[in-house]
Amino acid sequence: MMWWSLNLWTVFQILSNIYAGAKRWDNVAAVRKKMKRKRVRKEPGLSWVENQGRVHSFVVGDDAHEDMKLIRGMLEWLNLRSKRAGYTPNHEVILLDVDEDEKSRLLWLHSERIALALPFALLRTPPGSPIRIIKNLRICTDCHVALKLASKLVCREIVMRDINRFHHFRDGICSCNDYW
């Protein structure tokens, strides 16, 4: 049954993404309603980061961490510094019927960005030490761009393992050469 559920989830997700890409929001809502009725759930994006011997996990939009105030402050700082350095958000990866400002905000709530902010926000990692993040799904194109830029802005290597491969972000460049 698990194999069937996984494949059914994949079919529904692809269909929903196709409709969202075409901005057919009524069809997206119908697919999601059908998923709910059939109890087919989307796998949430999760990211893990180790900090001072403790593993922290985050989901998209997570606000449950004890240091979330510091993390949000660091995310805002990274967002502002990134914009000054030329970052422009790729709204196409947000497949929701919301305005552009909301899409920009939602991008900064992806689990890998929250995980990235934790070591900086807590100021507990030695300067120059790498940050290692694990993600259960493929990193989206916008987060890939943001992490490349973040590695340059904060002068740190960021090592991320997503479902496909390792990404080593250093000085604004990724080891995957932007192919993943």
Can you annotate each of these PLM segments?
Residues 1-180:
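Terminal (and in a subset, N-terminal) low-complexity or junction segments at the ends
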